[in-house]
């Protein structure tokens, strides 16, 4: 029998670290584009007794007994995911976005097959063919990028590379791209060479669910996403697809037993909650505000003389190039962090610096919008960022901004006390 004691009583060292992180989230402004704050209901599911249950297999086809209630939970998540995104197929078992992506590769490709994906240096993701990832090591990865004049995806280059290399799969999606992706253009290119089209919409899934960003699910052969970021659920993954019995069977077996063992049932339950939350009327208003906030911040920073890659944003994020100011992303990250503004350093197209230093930062608005910030607050925030960057990290300026950050964080708490 377990002793009925708290973490603080049993493990004060760990408890203190958790307490400190709770305080940090309340006292810092979160602008990392891939982060958000999930609801208390999502966290309740994550911390439930479901964490005790093993459930290898799928609803009605388990390798373990005692799964009758787990089956209900997983089926709820599946049905809600399909309804939310207009999908014919959903697999809610992937532990994370990268695991969802690796399952797609396993399902549709053989080692050595050619894949065409977006370059990490131009806004793609590790799993889109980067040399340091399984996707670039196991497969012959060809990379496309942005048009240097427009800062947008160079679809002519995508088509040229596709016709030249004949990839078996084209990957569309991004981790740092601020414009609307033309999913149909990718479909047309893929069809010219008989390739699969795989879309990774991890960053914009919440926007897609709310109808404020184009939905790729019925255009692509397979679509994946994380369930956090803009979707505002648990840190986990999801695979979606339009009707295709052959692909569905391959995806099922690629997730289990091909890529994973049993699902994390507590995370599956949390996904079911997050999908239901995304069906609420207020969710669309939230996602619309996310985009408005990102656009407002980009406008202010452009007015202050900073370069935004592709000239602005039509989603939840943008890349700020600091090449003109001769500021490294690493320094900008540190200076802003000292003022309790959390961003991440990020490479920009044709970046002369290494990925560990970079010449830019990535800014996203999902978390601050969850917190309740509107355009007035984020315009102030963008001005504070510019103040710190203009001063090259002057301590007095950082302290002045930090005081303003503390005041606005107190006004807009993440979670009710």
Curated annotation (Swiss-Prot):
Alphabetized InterPro entries for the sequence: PyrdxlP-dep_Trfase, PyrdxlP-dep_Trfase_major, PyrdxlP-dep_Trfase_small, Ser_HO-MeTrfase, Ser_HO-MeTrfase-like, Ser_HO-MeTrfase_PLP_BS, SHMT-like_dom
The reaction(s) this protein catalyses: (6R)-5,10-methylene-5,6,7,8-tetrahydrofolate + glycine + H2O = (6S)-5,6,7,8-tetrahydrofolate + L-serine
UniProt GO BP: glycine biosynthetic process from serine; tetrahydrofolate interconversion
Superkingdom: Bacteria
Documented EC number(s): 2.1.2.1
GO cellular component, one term: cytosol
Transmembrane stretches, start-end: none
Protein name per UniProt: Serine hydroxymethyltransferase
Protein species of origin: Acinetobacter radioresistens
